[in-house]
From Swiss-Prot:
Subunit record text: The 1.2 MDa TFIID complex is composed of TATA binding protein (TBP) and the 14 TBP-associated factors.
Protein name (Swiss-Prot/TrEMBL): Transcription initiation factor TFIID subunit 4
Places the protein is found: Nucleus
Gene that this sequence comes from: taf4
UniProt feature, compositional bias: Low complexity: 63-73
GO BP field: RNA polymerase II preinitiation complex assembly; transcription initiation at RNA polymerase II promoter
InterPro entries: Histone-fold, TAF4, TAF4_C
Major location (coarse): nucleus
Species of provenance: Schizosaccharomyces pombe (strain 972 / ATCC 24843) (Fission yeast)
Family, as annotated: Belongs to the TAF4 family.
Lineage, opening ranks: Eukaryota, Fungi, Dikarya, Ascomycota, Taphrinomycotina
One annotated GO molecular function: RNA polymerase II general transcription initiation factor activity
One GO CC term, this protein: transcription factor TFIID complex
Coiled-coil stretches: 202-236
Chain segments carrying region Disordered: 1-76, 225-259
Length: 365
C-alpha cells in the first residue's frame, strides 16, 4: 500500500453527491430518519405486518425533542437512542418503577400463595368438631348472643403453646434430675463428718461446765442469804457455840432443791468435769444407758448385727449418686413443673386438681 499518495476517492463517499446516484440495496430498503415529521418505529402495529415499519404520530410543534437549549447534534442523538430503546421493547417507565421498588416481591414470586387461604389464624391441634361443640355449649350456658369465628382457632393455638411450654419445662427438669455434678477438681482434705462430731462434743462439754458453774454460784448465793437471815434473828452472843448453832440452823433452813444442786456440784468437782481444764472421765460416766440387744439363742453368744445392706452407705459419709436412666420424663418431673406453674393465678382447680391427686397417689404406690 502506498502511504505517500492518498487513496483515491470512491464514488459515493462524498455527502454532496445526490442520493439518486448512490448504489441501493434492493433487499433492504432505505430507512429515512425523518419522513414528513414522522419517526419510524419497530414495535408491532395492527395495520402493519411482521417485519414492516410503521411510523409514529407526528410530534407537536410546541414540544421540543430535548429539554433546555441543546445543539442539533445532541437532539438527534437523543432521538436515535429513544428509537433504539423502543425498537428493543424496553419501556422506560416500567424500568424506572422496577428500580425504585425492592427486588424481592413474594406475591410475584409465589403465585400459589395468592390462591390459597390464610393459615395464620387456623390450627388443627384440637379436633375442630369437638371444640366447636364444647365452646357452643359454654356460650349457650352463659346466654351469649354471638361469638367470633376465630375463637376456635385461637383456643387451639393457645392450648398448643401452653402444652409446648410445659413439655419444655419437663425436659429441663429431667436433665436436671439425671445430670451429675463434676467434682473431679475438688479433693476432700479432711473428714467432715468426724470434724462436725468433734465440734458437737466440745460444745456439749463447754455447756456442761457452764451449767455446773452457774449451779455452784446459785447455791452459794442461797447459803449466804440463809446466813444473813439466821444472823438477824440471833443477835445475842458472839461465842463459838452460838456460831456453830447458827451455821447448823442455816444448813437446816436450806431447801431440798438447793441441797441437791450443791450435792451435784460437789460431785462434779470431785469428778473433775467442772474444772476449766477438764478432768478425768471414767468409762462408767461415758457409757450409754440404752439396753443391749439380746444375743442369738438367748444366752451368751455373738450379737446379731443390723442388716443395712439395703441402705446406701459410704466410708466418708457421702451417699453415692443414684444412677438413673436419661432421656425419660417421669411423674416427678411432671408434678414439679405443674406445682411451679403459675397459670390461672397460681392455683390448680377443676380437672387439673384431679389429675394432680391421681399422680400423687400413683407416685405413692
Amino acid at each position: 500500500m502506498d502511504l505517500n499518495n492518498p487513496p483515491s476517492k470512491r464514488f459515493g463517499d462524498d455527502d454532496d453527491i445526490p442520493a439518486n446516484k448512490r448504489p441501493k440495496n434492493e433487499e433492504y430498503p432505505e430507512i429515512p430518519g425523518y419522513l414528513g415529521n414522522r419517526k419510524p418505529s419497530y414495535t408491532q402495529n395492527p395495520n402493519s405486518g411482521p417485519g414492516k415499519l410503521h411510523y409514529a404520530s407526528p410530534r407537536p410543534n410546541n414540544v421540543s425533542s430535548s429539554v433546555g437549549v441543546a445543539s442539533g447534534g445532541d437532539r438527534q442523538e437523543a432521538d436515535q437512542l429513544q428509537d433504539a430503546l423502543i425498537s428493543c421493547g424496553i419501556q422506560l417507565k416500567e424500568e424506572e418503577l422496577n428500580l425504585s421498588t425492592s427486588f424481592y416481591d413474594p406475591s410475584s414470586l409465589n403465585t400459589f400463595a395468592l390462591t390459597t387461604e390464610d393459615r395464620s389464624r387456623k390450627s388443627d391441634f384440637l379436633n375442630s368438631f369437638v371444640l366447636m361443640q364444647t365452646v357452643s355449649n359454654i356460650v349457650n350456658l352463659h346466654r351469649l348472643k354471638s361469638m367470633d369465628s376465630d375463637i376456635h382457632a385461637l383456643i387451639s393455638m393457645a392450648v398448643r403453646d401452653y402444652l409446648a411450654n410445659l413439655l419444655q419445662k419437663m425436659i429441663v427438669e429431667s436433665h436436671h434430675r439425671t445430670s451429675q455434678l463434676h467434682t473431679d477438681n475438688y479433693k476432700q482434705v479432711d473428714n467432715v463428718r468426724q470434724t462436725l462430731a468433734n465440734f458437737a462434743y466440745k460444745e456439749y462439754e463447754s455447756e456442761e461446765r457452764r451449767r455446773t458453774v452457774l449451779n455452784i454460784r446459785r447455791a452459794e448465793h442461797e447459803a449466804r442469804l440463809a446466813e444473813l437471815n439466821s444472823a438477824s434473828t440471833n443477835e445475842e452472843g458472839s461465842s463459838r457455840r452460838r456460831k456453830e448453832q447458827s451455821s447448823s440452823a442455816a444448813a437446816k433452813n436450806i431447801s431440798e432443791d438447793a441441797q441437791n444442786r450443791m450435792t451435784n456440784a460437789t460431785a462434779s468437782i470431785m469428778a473433775g468435769s467442772a474444772l476449766p481444764s477438764g478432768g478425768k472421765k471414767y468409762s462408767w460416766m461415758a457409757t450409754d444407758m440404752t439396753p443391749m440387744t439380746p444375743a442369738v439363742g438367748g444366752g451368751f453368744g455373738i450379737r446379731k448385727k443390723d442388716s443395712n445392706s439395703l441402705k446406701p452407705s459410704s466410708r466418708d459419709g457421702v451417699l453415692p449418686l443414684q444412677q438413673e436412666e436419661k432421656g425419660i420424663i417421669t411423674i416427678r418431673d411432671a408434678l414439679a413443673v405443674l406445682e411451679m406453674d403459675r397459670e390461672g393465678a397460681g392455683r390448680i382447680f377443676g380437672r387439673g386438681a384431679k389429675a394432680m391427686m391421681r399422680a400423687y397417689i400413683r407416685l405413692k404406690d
